[in-house]
Amino acid sequence: LYVLASHFHPDHFNKEVLDWKTQRPDIIYIFSKDILKHRRAQKEDAVWLKKGEEYADETLSVRAFGSTDVGVSFLIEVENKKFFHAGDLNNWHWMEESTEQEWKGYEKNFLHEVDNLYDYTHELDVAMFPVDPRLGREYMRGPEQFVKRIKTNIFVFPLLDIRGRSRPRCYSEGDQKNA
């Protein structure tokens, strides 16, 4: 069993997962180094990755890519399949609150991180990506830019409602958008 956490925010990391080790001694935790930095876990608790680092064993490999918030995103390769967990990688543009210069800077950072992933792989079997309506009218901008750049067979995203609860969605290649 592998447990990954992309960063220390409570919607992405809960310390209670460390207790699972009592039931599953074979568990391997792979965490972003910012979790250690923010003292949410101890050094001996996990394998710690920052952008550009990789963990590999006989079952899988995990490469850490960047984020446009904190922590990392993960590319997981297992049995010739590629899974991408974006963490908080998104085009956090906040167009309705930011100046044009600010949101274009946010977008540039996002596209740079997507290009870094593209330089490593052009295609994903599954991508898990945050979608947040708080971004306003353009809340799908980041996800659309992502799938336009990187061929993605299945795109899964938690859509946060106005109360912050998650409503997971999944689209396969060829599906029509009908959120």
Where are these regions (language model features)?
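Binuclear metal-ion centers of metallo-dependent hydrolases, dominated by the metallo-beta-lactamase
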Residues: 40-57, 139-179
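Active-site metal-binding loops of divalent metal-dependent hydrolases
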Residues: 7-8, 34-35, 67, 86-92, ...
